[in-house]
Design a protein with these regions (language model features):
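An anion/pyrophosphate-binding glycine-rich loop and adjacent beta-alpha core
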Residues: 1-62, 118-124, 132, 144-151
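Glycine- and aromatic-enriched mobile tails/lids
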Residues: 2-6, 17-20, 70, 76-90, ...
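Long, contiguous hydrophobic alpha-helical segments, chiefly transmembrane helices and signal peptides
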Residues: 29, 62-64, 94, 220
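FAD/FMN-dependent oxidoreductases across multiple families
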Residues: 46-89
Length: 248
């Protein structure tokens, strides 16, 4: 138990929920909000979603389980969303501005959203043809019909091996499977969004896994059962490059 109970940091609460689910061999635990006066007005979207499944959150407990929620990290940018590519901006969860650390603080995304709006208003004059044209010359046709299946497979890999609890053995296995997916689609033409999206997901998954393997400690949402303690030498951001696939 934690001294702050349900007000403990999100990573702590998620690990506690995960532990209970494992002990009970269950796919969820129960959240009791029936004693919270006006809970439907406080959380209208949750209340409406639960109603669709026949649950009245003012009278019944809610089945819950940890899930991916917010990206802490992303494309390296400055405070104004500039990347190292001319004309390419990254904002919100796509970007790593330095605002987020190893844990997500409530409402920080609102600050990033306000900044993104200001950037958008200031960048309307920028030309749209700064980037290079995508070339399919010499590439073999891609089989786009399996992108949904492979996307689900990638999600399963990341959830299993890089979810709430991580270790070297699991992440090494994840990297093998991610690299296998990457080789499968290497050299394929990709003109449709589902294929472009899948290839980008594979790239990001590989970079996240390599970075997590390199960080031999636990900090915030990055929890390693083989390195459960926080280490001062890792009190910094990790920057990983696709070109080198090594952390800097």
């Amino acid at each position: 138990s934690h001294k702050m109970a349900e007000l403990a940091p999100r990573d702590v609460v998620a690990r506690c929920i995960f532990k209970e689910m494992q002990q009970d061999k269950a796919d969820h635990i129960w959240l009791d909000a029936t004693q919270v006066e006006g809970v439907e007005k406080m959380f209208p979207m949750i209340a409406d979603t639960c109603k669709e499944y026949g649950i009245d959150i003012s009278k019944e407990m809610i089945p819950i389980a940890p899930a991916a929620h917010y990206m802490m990290g992303g494309v390296r940018t400055d405070a104004d969303g500039h990347t190292n590519i001319d004309g390419l901006y990254a904002v919100g969860e796509t970007a790593c501005t330095g605002l987020q650390g190893a844990n997500r603080l409530a409402s920080n995304s609102l600050l990033e959203g306000r900044t993104a709006l200001a950037i958008r208003q200031d960048s309307e004059h920028l030309p749209l043809d700064l980037g290079q044209q995508w070339k399919n010359d010499g590439l073999r046709p891609a089989q786009d019909d399996d992108t949904d299946l492979q996307t689900q497979r990638l999600q399963q890999i990341m959830s299993t091996y890089l979810g709430i609890r991580r270790d070297k053995e699991g992440m090494t296995q994840a990297l093998k499977e991610i690299d296998k997916l990457a080789r499968h689609y290497d050299g394929c033409s990709a003109t449709q969004y589902p294929m472009l999206d899948l290839r980008a997901r594979i790239t990001v998954a590989g970079l996240v896994t390599r970075s997590a393997l390199e960080r031999e400690e636990s900090r915030g949402a990055h929890y390693r059962s083989d390195f459960p303690e926080t280490k001062d030498e890792w009190k910094r951001h990790s920057i990983i490059s696709k070109a080198t696939a090594t952390t800097l």
